[in-house]
Amino acid sequence: MRRFTMLASLLMVLCLQMAAQTWEDVKVGTSTRKTLTYVPKNVEKSPALVISLHGMNQDPGYQQNQTQWNALADTEGLIVTYPLGNNRMWDTHGMGDVMFVEAVMKDMELKHHVDKNRIYLSGFSMGSW
């Protein structure tokens, strides 16, 4: 039993030292949208933020794997978030997704204390529209 307790304690410590990746809810007007956020274990006190938008018919997981922003986050101590477009697309004709990205920025400032002077937007295909 003692070995099990020691092993469980060691696993807990190792898990706490690992980077955190979570789905976060972002309020946009009366609706709630999702963004996949990666926070490295060595995050700065007031980190930079990269917002990375996926292409049409893709999702945040795909965008994350293709861009490798998380590796840069691990090296530089910044935060990366991958918003999810409605129906895996972005609104190219209205302002809905502009408001979503603005809400993501404000949400990241509140939750993760990102430096609002170091927020960067990146996208692929329809996500770079």
Spans of features found by a protein language model:
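Short substrate-entry loop that stabilizes the transition state in hydrolases
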Residues: V43-W90
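Sec/Tat-exported extracytoplasmic proteins
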Residues: T35, V39, H54-P60, E76, ...
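Alpha/beta-hydrolase active-site loop
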Residues: H93-K116
